[in-house]
Structure formats: structure tokens, C-alpha cells
Amino acid sequence: MHAILFGATGMIGQGLLRELLLDPGVQRVLVVVRRPTGVSHPKLSEIVHADFYDFSSIAAQLSGYDACFFCLGVTSLGKSEAEYRRLTYDLTLAAATTLAPLNPKMAFLYVSGTGTDSSERGRTMWARVKGATENALLRLFPNACMIRPGYIQPMHGVQSPSKGTRRAYAIVGVAYPLLRALFPKSVTNTEELSRAMIRAARGEAPKKILEPADLIALGSVLKS
């Protein structure tokens, strides 16, 4: 697999990058970032790009890939619907519409979230916007897959870029084994989620929209 990763410096992206580099079936990983990851690996190449609404200047470097993992996302708290849509729908589609003609058979995996509203008509703003984004990607890529995780526990030194979020995970992490036991179909971790996403990119997912239980089932299968 030759893969492109957006969002490599975020918590989910960090975990996914780790698993992509460890996976012997992944030969090449390109990360597109606003700031360097600081990660060095023979399989890894990196493009530092400032404008995530316009990829025309680097488009020539984005062809020849089998999969794209799009892990960028922001909270909707404190944002108007117009602002959140620009940071979610518009930003994602800027990358997707650049990649689609270059890699028409690409598997495009988008990290959304459980509770996303596919009807786009619900009362919850973030869920409507995420739903619109998912629907646009499903129309654009025949091999698109939507990733809707629930609670995710960071593993293997993975950390959220946000200091407040890191503190919250440090507190909740103490109870992670209990949460996992109580909610086995809702609580996952960065390693398991990443394995599920890689398998989905290889066409092993049972459907195009994967909820928490689907991701846990797919990610917990032992490697053959």
C-alpha cells in the first residue's frame, strides 16, 4: 500500500502513522502537514504545506497512491455553523477534490465521529456538517469509507496536541481498562482504531460507514 495521511500531528494521526510505518504491507507513507512531524523513517516522506484549501502547487506529488487517511478535525465548540463548515467540509473537500482525479481508485478514509447525521437535517450542528462531508466523499470516491469512532484512548506515547485534552486523557486513562470492560463496543484505543482503518483501506471493511463496534471488531482481529 502507498498511503497519504493528513493530520499526522493530531492524536489519531500520530497513532495511525505509527501503525502504517510498522505494517509490512505498507510500502510508502506520505504525510501532508502544516508543521513538520519530527518523525524519520525509510518509508516516510513529508510535505509541509501552508494552505490546506489549495493543493494545486503540490498536486503533482499526490498521484500514485492507493489510500488516503484524512484525520484532520476541529471541535465545533465556540464556532458558528459557517465557520465550522469551512474548517470541516470545505477543508476536507479541498483535499478530496484534488486527489480524486489523480487517484480515482483510491480508498479515502475520513475520520468523522459517532453520532454523525447522514440526513444532514438534524438539530445538532456538528453532526449535520460531518454528515454533509461524509456524503460528499461517498459520492466522490467509489472506495470511500467513513470512520466513526467513539471514545479513543491514546497508546504508545501518542498525545493530543491540546494541553487540556492531554490532561483529560491522563485522568480518564486510569479508568480505561474499566471503561473498556463496561463498554466493549464503544471504547477503543489508537492502536486498535489504526489497525481497523488500515484494514478498511485494504477493502476488508464490511460496509462504508463504520461505527465504534465495527471499528473495534475490525481492529481487534489478529494479523494473519
Enumerate the predicted regions with their spans.
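Residues at the starts of beta-strands that form the adenosine-phosphate
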Residues: 2, 25-28, 105-107, 143
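Hydrophobic/aromatic beta-strand patches that form the interior of the parallel beta-sheet core
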Residues: 30-32, 47, 69, 109, ...
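N-terminal Rossmann NAD(P)H-binding glycine-rich loop of SDR-like oxidoreductase domains
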Residues: 2-23
